[in-house]
């Protein structure tokens, strides 16, 4: 289970693993905290790329990666891209966020938990709810919960995940 921590400028923040952190969209103070923690990559999963955040992250010497997606439409490509960033940067400390750090961030972390740590969909969904996952996103995102429950099957059958699974089997 993610270890919740409290820092100025970082809401809904937790350590998922020693190299993966999660939370809500950080402000200037939060970005400075992330830099002090040794974060090298900030993944923004908000619905659109933030030029302002990209500049602030770059000025602090971190790398900004936008993986924008609109909440009602989760798709395998988004999560494959997220997992690829993690796999391509095994020594980097990574922070992932969306606006509130609950629904999109929760789904990204759940995809990591199921793909890399072997969690069941129910275990991942339980953690998502502990970090504020709504499953219906204020009446907008009805398909989120069903997508997460079906994710293990997507992971096995969608070719977009094939490269990730091949890498994983080679590293064991």
Where are these regions (language model features)?
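Short cysteine clusters
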Residues: 98
């Amino acid at each position: 289970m993610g270890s919740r921590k409290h820092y100025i400028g970082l809401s809904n923040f937790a350590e998922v693993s020693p190299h993966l952190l999660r939370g809500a969209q950080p402000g200037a103070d939060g970005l400075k905290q992330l830099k002090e923690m040794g974060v090298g990559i900030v993944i923004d999963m908000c619905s659109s790329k933030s030029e302002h955040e990209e500049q602030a992250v770059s000025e602090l010497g971190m790398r900004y990666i936008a993986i924008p997606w609109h909440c009602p439409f989760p798709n395998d490509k988004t999560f494959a891209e997220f997992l690829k960033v993690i796999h391509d940067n095994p020594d980097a400390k990574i922070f992932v966020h969306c606006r509130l750090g609950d629904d999109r961030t929760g789904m990204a972390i759940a995809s990591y938990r199921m793909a890399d740590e072997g969690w069941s969909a129910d275990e991942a969904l339980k953690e998502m709810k502990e970090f504020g996952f709504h499953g219906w996103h204020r009446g907008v995102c009805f398909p989120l919960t069903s997508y997460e429950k079906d994710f293990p099957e997507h992971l096995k059958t969608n070719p977009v995940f094939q490269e990730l699974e091949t890498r994983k089997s080679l590293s064991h």
